[in-house]
Amino acid sequence: MASIVTRKSSFAVVYMTTVNGVRKQKWETYHTLPEAVRRKEQLERYHDLRKSKKIGGEVETVAQLMSVYLRLHGVPRWSPSTYQSNCGLIQHYIPPCMGDMRLSELSPRTVAALYSQMLEEPRISSPYHKQGGQKLSPTTLRSIHKVLHSAFEQAVLWEYVDRNPFHRAPLPTCRPKQKAFLTPEQIKQLVLHCPPTLALAIHLTFAASLRKGELLALTWQDIDFSRNTLRIDKTLARIGRDAVNQVNQREILHRFPPVGGRQRTVLVLKQPKTESSVRTVYLPPSLMTLLKQSRPAGWETGGQPSPHLIFAYPDGRPMQECTLTKQFQQALKEAGLPKVTFHSLRYSSISYKLSLSGGDIKAVQRDSGHAQADMITELYGQVLEQNRWDLVERFEEVFYCAD
């Protein structure tokens, strides 16, 4: 069992551990007593779990650790969508590359070699991403690293290893591609070629900087017509049925019944992934007028038993992302505009607001719901690039062509 030893300006948690069959005493230093108490309680809970055999036998390989990690860390902590994506990464990449390796064999040097090897491996194909001879991307490797780093942080806590070999592992540089999106003038042209429902979806996405899942989750009750505001506090997602049944369902707000026979996925309204995604956005008066003209009879009472969604099929089921995408691409074609994704409207919105606000990143971030300002500043760079060309043209006009 662990104990706390008081020092001059710190506190040490002292306990016995076994590494590679050798029993030894370990000291961990904390600057405050509450931190030391929390660590002591963690160690005691782990000791109780081992004693009750809920963790299972000894964990010696990476594959065994990932199994315990999913059960003790993933299931109680992750949302269904996070569980589904992380399970996919673990299943497809981690056991094939390092599953049989013993935990004691991993070192920072070994991890660097493994990552170099993984970048030469072909990417796993899926119904959405065909293999096509492409290699594993740096972005995917970073996602794999995030899971492995977290798993080995728990392994240190659970006393399977002394230190995390994935800490400060060398990762490939991700060079983000410049994002293609429509200008405000092109969006005005686009809505002229859209049916009313699609036009409303474009207006809302552009004015409120919405993600696609946030747009399709909107209900009429989310709009405050007296204050011209829109409340964004949920998202529409399609999640594997197994993932929904495995993890805690506290983040799921509504589960839509399946259509037809038994399906492997389920459509749900769920809480957003981050707290910053929950926000209230002010809408322009012209858009509020359009919303008032579009709202159906009985919108005030809400949908029972299903939510009264703004974008839904006639039977009340939520509009699918594929339907929205298909209609959007058809409208782009008819308008003679370049092919971009529906999600790019969010980039158009953010860049336009940055330009209008003179680069007020904080104000735009509160509208977009980004947890970090990195994405905002990246788009701001593209806005500034256009401003630089405008400045050159103005310089030419005023200085060189003045005579």
Regions found by a protein language model. Name each.
Residues I124-Y128, Q134-P138, R142-I144, L157, ...:
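Basic, Lys/Arg- and aromatic-enriched nucleic-acid-binding interface segment
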Residues V14, S137, G261-V268, T274-P338:
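Active-site/catalytic core of tyrosine-dependent DNA strand-transfer enzymes
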Residues L157, H203, A207, E214, ...:
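C-terminal catalytic core of tyrosine-transesterase DNA break-rejoin enzymes
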Residues R227, T235-V278, P285-L287, P314, ...:
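C-terminal secondary-structure termini that scaffold catalytic or DNA-interacting sites
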Residues T173, F181, L236-R238, S368-E393:
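Catalytic-site neighborhood detector that most strongly recognizes the C-terminal catalytic loop/helix
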Residues V5-F11, T17-A113, S294, G298-S306, ...:
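N-terminal DNA-binding module of tyrosine recombinases/phage integrases
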Residues M1-H31, K234-L236, G240-Q263:
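Short, Arg/Lys-rich segments that mark the N-terminal edge of DNA/RNA- and chromatin-recognition modules
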Residues S3, L70-Y160, R317-T323, P338-S344, ...:
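N-terminal core-binding DNA-recognition domain of tyrosine site-specific recombinases/integrases
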